[in-house]
A protein has these predicted regions:
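Positively charged n-region of N-terminal signal peptides that target proteins for export
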Residues: 1-4
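Intrinsically disordered and other compositionally biased segments
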Residues: 6-7, 26
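Bacterial N-terminal signal peptides
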Residues: 9-20
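N-terminal secretory/targeting leader peptides
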Residues: 26-119, 134-339
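Signature of the catalytic double-stranded beta-helix
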Residues: 122-135
């Protein structure tokens, strides 16, 4: 009888050992939190989910990340500071939601005539690598990404000429507020999560945003017209950062793995912006939305209206003790080399 029990005891002891090792491994795993303002169903949130899973997979479970989409951990405008102060370990939001805090990176958001999110994403990361701006030194930048061309979107009134912009209120942020003002509109600076209700309530006549927002933020339900002013299209730069202390505490091999994943994912974000722009425009038109083009002569008027914004921004950088000419010229040169 004793001989019969020996194999069973060995199996039980083995299982107990495995369970103990597993419990210890789980207890020793690094647990991080990730705050993100995009809705859970948005393609950008899906990319955050897949990034978190990839980190867990490649580190063999040594790092586990809890993702909080839809502003459930920190609000969009509080996300950066929330990471710096440790309210979340990682965060994804918009640099321009913290006004005037990121002057160098704000250059990317100027009306330079972007044609794609993939290009805008590449420009943002190249500018960061070139200048390593001090404004981002209180966090560890994982990577940056940027959406496709932002256009003029309205509810109830079509914008076909520059004069049609006069007096219209547009939800916008950052450099886009300067663009709206230069075109004759009135900027209403609030984060994107508030856009839908703002337009629906009549407190804004529209918004400046890329086509993806018609589906990703359901704005096709409250906007009727898109004015395709590609000649002055701008982008918005998004950050993905981690708390510096949390980053510095990670083992070196894990840092290497995460950096490799970052390089892969920033490309995916840029490509996703372009794919979702196509889907967003289809969604908009399926809801009865109308796309309005600009004649070349009219486009030239729009371009002239915003031209001073770039020069003024260069001057503002100089006033901060930064080399505005180098920063702006590098951004424009990099963009032109890619599109």
């Amino acid at each position: 009888m004793k001989k019969a029990y020996l194999p069973l005891m060995a199996v039980c002891m083995g299982l107990a050992f495995v369970a103990l090792v597993t419990v210890k491994a789980q207890a020793a795993s690094i647990k991080l939190t990730y705050s993100n303002f995009f809705p859970a169903a948005h393609i950008q949130s899906q990319l955050v989910d897949s990034w978190c899973r990839e980190v867990e997979t490649r580190t063999k479970g040594r790092v586990n990340i809890k993702h909080y989409p839809g502003q459930t951990l920190t609000k969009a405008g509080e996300c950066y500071e929330g990471v710096v102060k440790g309210r979340s370990d990682l965060g994804l939001s918009v640099l321009s939601y913290t006004q005037d805090r990121f002057p160098v990176m704000g250059t990317v958001d100027l009306p330079l005539g972007y044609t794609s999110g993939k290009v805008a994403t590449a420009v943002a990361n190249e500018l960061y690598r070139k200048f390593r701006p001090k404004e981002l030194s209180d966090s560890k930048v994982m990577y940056l990404h940027a959406h496709g061309p932002a256009l003029v979107n309205t509810r109830g009134k079509a914008v076909r000429r520059l004069e049609d912009m006069k007096g219209l209120r547009f939800r916008t942020t950052g450099a886009a507020a300067l663009i709206v003002k230069a075109l004759g509109g009135i900027p209403v600076s609030v984060p994107m999560p508030e856009c839908y209700q703002l337009i629906k309530s009549g407190k804004a006549n529209g918004s400046t945003h890329p086509a993806e927002s018609h589906k990703g933020w359901k704005l096709a339900e409250v906007e009727n017209y898109v004015t395709a002013a590609y000649c002055i299209s701008y982008t918005t730069t998004f950050f993905v950062i981690i708390n510096k202390d949390k980053w510095n505490a990670l083992p070196q091999d894990i840092k290497v793995i995460i950096e490799q994943i970052n390089n892969e994912w920033l490309l995916q974000h840029g490509e996703a912006w372009d794919t979702s722009d196509t889907e967003g425009m289809q969604f908009f038109q399926a809801h009865g939305g109308q796309l309005i083009g600009l004649e070349s002569s009219e486009a030239a008027r729009w371009k002239m209206a915003v031209a001073s914004i770039i020069d003024d921004y260069m001057t503002s950088l100089n006033e901060r003790g930064l080399n505005g000419r180098d920063i702006v010229d590098f951004t424009i040169k990099t963009l032109n080399s890619m599109q």
